[in-house]
């Protein structure tokens, strides 16, 4: 079953709430951007401070490449028109001395973010249920001059990221999940790392992080497994899926659930305000 709305591309980090039920006012802080700073900054990019100026941090965001928040636009005096210009993104190399970045800098902010299959790619991936409460690596910080939006993401994985990884997964976002039904054929025993299914349409793409469920009496039962290798169905008939260690026997009707988006926050030690 396809999701609506569909997630077609990464869009950066979108602030949605604060952790712990705190009141979220959507407040921001202004930081200067250096005259003629040469790197573009897009709406939804993580930013850091360099000598007091907002800049793009070194990739990947982690406990070494720390951040001060997420860029939500800027304003400056247009050097040609001499009028104040408000912009979704900073294009880079602007000859103005009053460039001001608008930054969501609260370290308790929760962000909605899409997963991609690679750090610099735009192909949408999946965040596994196995990783909730664990760490995940962030993608590279690029964006679109057409929309002004970032294409930063988190990177699909079948195992938790290192303790230095930039983000902690707080929860999955069910609204945009994609469910694909198929039929169990063989394998799929507890501790196994593969299962054979049938009934998948040709060209169906299943990214790493796609979770494997049994459909039992109309209810989803998690098998404790997720795809550890991406799979594209090339022929009708049987498809072998490579998965993490299975906890519950796969059987009957199988539902493969992709989760393109998750709620995350910056890990402790990644945000500059949480560093001693």
Model-derived regions: residue spans:
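Surface-exposed, low-hydrophobicity beta-strand/loop segments enriched in small/polar/acidic residues
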Residues: 1-186, 190, 198, 207, ...
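Signature of Asx- and small-polar-rich beta-strand/turn repeats characteristic
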Residues: 237-243
């Amino acid at each position: 079953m396809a999701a609506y709305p569909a997630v077609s591309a990464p869009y950066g980090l979108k602030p949605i709430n604060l952790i712990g039920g705190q009141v979220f006012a959507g407040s921001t802080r202004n930081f200067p951007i250096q005259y003629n700073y040469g790197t573009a900054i897009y709406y939804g990019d993580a930013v850091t401070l360099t000598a007091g100026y907002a800049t793009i941090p070194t990739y990947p965001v982690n406990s070494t490449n720390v951040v001060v928040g997420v860029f939500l636009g800027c304003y400056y005096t247009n050097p040609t028109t001499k009028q104040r210009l408000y912009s979704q993104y900073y294009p880079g190399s602007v000859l103005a001395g009053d460039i001001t970045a608008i930054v969501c800098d609260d370290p308790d902010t929760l962000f909605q973010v899409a997963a991609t299959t690679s750090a610099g790619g735009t192909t949408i991936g999946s965040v596994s249920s196995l990783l909730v409460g664990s760490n995940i690596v962030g993608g590279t910080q690029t964006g679109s001059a057409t929309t002004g939006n970032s294409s930063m993401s988190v990177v699909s994985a079948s195992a938790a990221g290192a303790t230095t990884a930039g983000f902690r997964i707080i929860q999955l976002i069910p609204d945009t999940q994609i469910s694909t039904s198929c039929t169990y054929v063989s394998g799929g025993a507890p501790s196994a790392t593969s299962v054979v299914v049938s009934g998948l349409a040709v060209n169906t793409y299943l990214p790493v992080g796609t979770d494997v469920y049994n459909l039992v009496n109309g209810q989803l039962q998690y098998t404790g497994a997720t795809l550890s290798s991406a799979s594209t169905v090339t022929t009708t008939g049987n498809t072998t899926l490579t998965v993490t260690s299975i906890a519950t026997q796969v059987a009957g009707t199988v539902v493969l659930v992709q989760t393109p988006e998750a709620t995350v926050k910056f890990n402790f030690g990644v945000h500059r305000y949480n560093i001693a």
